[in-house]
């Protein structure tokens, strides 16, 4: 749909009756919830003397950072805390969620890169064992449907650790459970575009390790293919999370979906915005990659009869954003402000409020 004329029949500035705020996190600075709350504060300050609009804030995630919080906030689920192992087999406390009969799992809760000190990161040793423990905990509680966010892993073990932690129960889980993977990664398991070559260097692997990890993944895929009679190692997303994508696709017949789109569907986003007249989304930095399936672009695809603003920490390619259909493109960070200053949470919070007030004054 051509959105360029949609905004002409909606008023600018104040006068909005219902506003939906659904921003991704400003990574390394503010969570999705904190960004949303800052925008809401700016809206409320401007409308203080008028009839305040209804404001609905929706925590967002693309399947990585913040996915668990986003689902539980939107769908009012239960938070479950367990003891499990991290990627170096150290005992930690980790959380997952249960919404109705579905478990919401972030692999980063157990196999997360952020849990491992930089000097200890080693994907040759890192294991997804703790993820297997978490899935088993939910399974024993009666959960049979799983949504798994694949972002932020420290591992490159193709899910072998997860499968070992399940023991023979992986066969029952395969028969009885369904898995949906939240990930925007489309890489295969092996080769120059695979898990080892593309992602392992970010997890501490040197060139020799990368080759060894790729060889290990290839051998595991060959053995698995002989066992099942089919091979998912080339499937889009098999290379996600150090090959965990492959393990779920090959062993549990998982369905892989873009994380942002999955969240929007699960929370009923289309119904929520039906009677809204303004949607505000954003992220830490918006550029042409934003239009390649990142959260703001996914939200843009759902917006038809509403205005939509893109409110991000930084913005490149502003014209491309406007041409794509955003009615306003707002950079909250002043041009002259150094990045290290702008990344301070309190500074970013205040920048957002000021930028929103200025937009409503237009």
Go through the PLM ranges and name each one.
Residues 7-362:
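N-terminal loops that bind phosphate or other acidic moieties
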């Amino acid at each position: 749909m051509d959105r360029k004329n949609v905004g002409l029949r909606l008023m600018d500035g104040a006068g909005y009756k219902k506003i939906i705020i659904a921003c991704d996190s400003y990574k390394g600075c503010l969570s999705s919830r904190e960004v949303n709350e800052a925008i809401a504060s700016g809206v409320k300050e401007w409308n203080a003397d008028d009839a305040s609009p209804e404001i609905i804030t929706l925590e967002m995630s693309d399947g990585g950072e913040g996915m668990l919080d986003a689902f539980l906030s939107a769908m009012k689920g239960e938070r479950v805390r367990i003891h499990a192992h991290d990627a170096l087999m150290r005992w930690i406390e980790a959380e997952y969620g249960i919404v109705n009969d579905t478990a919401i799992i972030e692999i980063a809760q157990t196999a997360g890169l952020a849990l491992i000190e930089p000097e200890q990161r080693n994907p040759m040793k890192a294991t997804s064992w703790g993820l297997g423990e978490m899935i088993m905990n939910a399974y024993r509680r009666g959960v049979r449907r799983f949504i798994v966010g694949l972002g932020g892993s420290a591992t490159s073990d193709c899910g072998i650790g997860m499968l070992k932690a399940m023991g023979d129960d992986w066969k029952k889980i395969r028969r009885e459970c369904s898995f949906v993977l939240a990930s925007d990664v489309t890489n295969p398991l092996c080769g120059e575009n695979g898990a080892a070559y593309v992602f392992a260097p970010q997890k501490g692997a040197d060139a020799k390790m990368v080759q060894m990890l790729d060889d290990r993944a290839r051998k595991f895929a060959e053995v698995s293919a002989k066992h099942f009679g089919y091979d998912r190692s080339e499937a889009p997303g098999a290379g996600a999370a150090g090959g965990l994508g492959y393990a779920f696709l090959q062993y549990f017949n998982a369905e892989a979906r873009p994380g942002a789109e999955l969240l929007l569907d699960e929370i009923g986003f289309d119904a929520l915005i039906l009677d809204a007249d303004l949607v505000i989304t954003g992220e830490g930095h918006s550029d042409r990659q934003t239009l390649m399936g990142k959260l703001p672009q996914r939200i843009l695809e759902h917006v038809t009869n509403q205005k939509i603003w893109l409110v991000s920490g930084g913005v490149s390619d502003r014209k491309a954003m406007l041409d794509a259909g955003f009615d306003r493109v707002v950079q909250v960070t002043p041009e002259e402000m150094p990045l290290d200053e702008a990344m301070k949470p309190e500074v970013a919070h205040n920048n957002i409020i000021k930028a929103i007030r200025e937009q409503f004054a237009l």
